[in-house]
UniProtKB/Swiss-Prot annotation:
A Pfam cross-reference name: RNA_pol_Rpb6
Family label: Belongs to the RNA polymerase subunit omega family.
EC number(s) from the headed UniProt entry: 2.7.7.6
Record carries keyword Transcription: yes
UniProt name for this protein: DNA-directed RNA polymerase subunit omega
Gene: rpoZ
Species assigned in the record: Brucella anthropi (strain ATCC 49188 / DSM 6882 / CCUG 24695 / JCM 21032 / LMG 3331 / NBRC 15819 / NCTC 12168 / Alc 37) (Ochrobactrum anthropi)
BP-aspect Gene Ontology terms: DNA-templated transcription
NCBIfam families named in the record: rpoZ (TIGR00690)
Keywords: DNA-directed RNA polymerase, Nucleotidyltransferase, Transcription, Transferase
Gene3D superfamilies: 3.90.940.10
Assembly with partners or alone: The RNAP catalytic core consists of 2 alpha, 1 beta, 1 beta' and 1 omega subunit. When a sigma factor is associated with the core the holoenzyme is formed, which can initiate transcription.
InterPro entries: DNA-dir_RNA_pol_omega, Pol_omega/Rpo6/RPB6, RPB6/omega-like_sf
Domain of life of the organism encoding this protein: Bacteria
Length: 134
């Protein structure tokens, strides 16, 4: 049954490797609960997927697009870039002004430490215990 189904599908999808990818993807969709578009006739999911492709109840192009979307991890969104450089320039100036204002308001005073105080502090540190993890 499956061999005849594959031969029927080659007319719809010329590349057998692509056919395997599409049918496998559709079979996984059926396993996850997607509605089938033909009678099951006690066939397993891969055979049902091949029969759906052969009967053209599903478009191979739609399946291919769905497969691509299921494999994508990062989807780039095309946005207009014509107005973006002007906005970036003005927003970078605003950010610079905001940082300057914040720096004036939140001046943090650090304690000054002499070299002797620093050395005394370092001598007071306890070395970590050696273990055999390395």
């Amino acid at each position: 049954m499956a061999r005849v189904t594959v031969e029927d599908c080659v007319d719809k999808v010329e590349n057998r490797f692509e056919l395997v990818l599409l049918a496998g993807h559709r079979a996984r969709q059926i396993s996850q609960g997607a509605q089938i578009t033909i009678d099951r006739d006690n066939d397993k999911n891969p055979v049902v997927a091949l029969r759906e492709i052969a009967d053209e109840t599903l478009s191979p192009d739609d399946l291919k697009e769905d497969l691509i979307h299921s494999l994508q991890k990062h989807v780039e969104v095309d946005e207009p870039e014509a107005a973006a450089p002007a906005q970036i320039a003005s927003s970078s100036e605003e950010v610079a002004e905001g940082i300057a204002d914040a720096a004036e308001e939140d001046m943090v005073a650090f304690d000054r430490m002499s070299e002797e105080e620093l050395l005394a502090g370092i001598e007071g540190l306890v070395a970590p215990e050696k273990n055999d993890d390395f």
